[in-house]
Amino acid sequence: MMRVVHLIWSLSTGGVETMLVDIINEQVKHALVSLIVMNDSVDSELIRNLDKKCNVLCCSRKAGTKNPLPLIKLNYWLFKIKPDIIHVHGGGLGKVSLYPSPKVFTIHNAHSAPSEYKKYKALYAISKAVQEYTRGQGFESVVVENGIRVKDIRVKEDNSASETMQIVQIGRLYHPHKGQHILIEAMNILVNEMKEKIISVDFIGEGSSYKYLVGLVCKYHLEEHVRFLGGHTRKFIYDNLCNYDLLIQPSISEGFGLTVAEAMVAGVPVLVSNVPGTMEVIGQGKYGKYFETDNPRSLANSILQIKTDGCNRKRLKEARDYAISNFDISHTAQTYLAEYKRILNKS
């Protein structure tokens, strides 16, 4: 069987890390898979979710340290495993892994630095938007779209309007990229200017912007309308996403948008900023609504329009079918395995 090593800096809760676990759990059915985590940031829940057939190795490096021991560990394990392919998921890792197997790299966002791209046998973009960005940097890449565990997501059974419009935003609380402040600003317009009182937002996630975002909520006196639920397991999200009336992804920068695809599978309407990554997920507007990026009033008007118009059941079913057909994790994992074989056949 093919021996594959996935190499990543950390395994904390996030879109990249969570999806990597899902990919590995599919790939172990067809290959001998190892995961090497460089830093000491490891989420126990993600480790528990990994298939036992995956060989997990942690270098326990402290972020920022110059201690060479973790690098020695990394290369000791690589020479012991003798992988056929090394799949890298973080900038800088390719140049410190010395084993002479072909290395490939997944570009997860539209602000990756291309300084080490030449070291890889292949580059993979998670969306056409990221592929275009990478092409603009002078490098070609193959699109392998992100995937989700579609069978695990509970589906919304009743799309009738609830008394209070319940909105959810899921993701790392880092507003310069994820744009949560735009949603809070839009809530200020809706609640305090437009007097739309029967509306609420739940933020699910953790991150460095938490205090800033809480401060904005207090500034606009939105405490009765906005909640921060903290980080939650994937099971919690997949079980509860269907209870919401709308998912909003207000990103200022986004390579793909996993939570948007998850909401589509759950039968929940989606509203996204018109950045290329999220627009790609909703079929350029065919399977969801969008608003002008970094524009709270555009977002507020879009929310109000959705609240007024209600749900289009036919469109929601089409969106769900589209997401299931295009974003199933099994397809993502199989595509990568096929790519590995292609590269090995060329070597």
Describe the predicted segments one by one:
Residues 214-232:
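Nucleotide-activated donor-binding/catalytic signature segment of Leloir-type glycosyltransferases, i.e.
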Residues 252:
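Aromatic "clamp/platform" in nucleotide-sugar-dependent glycosyltransferases that forms part
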Residues 129, 147:
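Carbohydrate-associated surface elements
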Residues 284-296, 305-310:
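Conserved acidic donor-binding segment of nucleotide-sugar-dependent glycosyltransferases
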Residues 269-272:
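Short hydrophobic beta-strand element within catalytic cores of glycosyltransferases
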Residues 6-69, 207-210, 274:
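N-terminal strand-loop element at the rim of the active site
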Residues 14-22, 165, 174-192, 208-214:
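A conserved mid-protein helix/loop that constitutes part of the nucleotide-sugar donor-binding site
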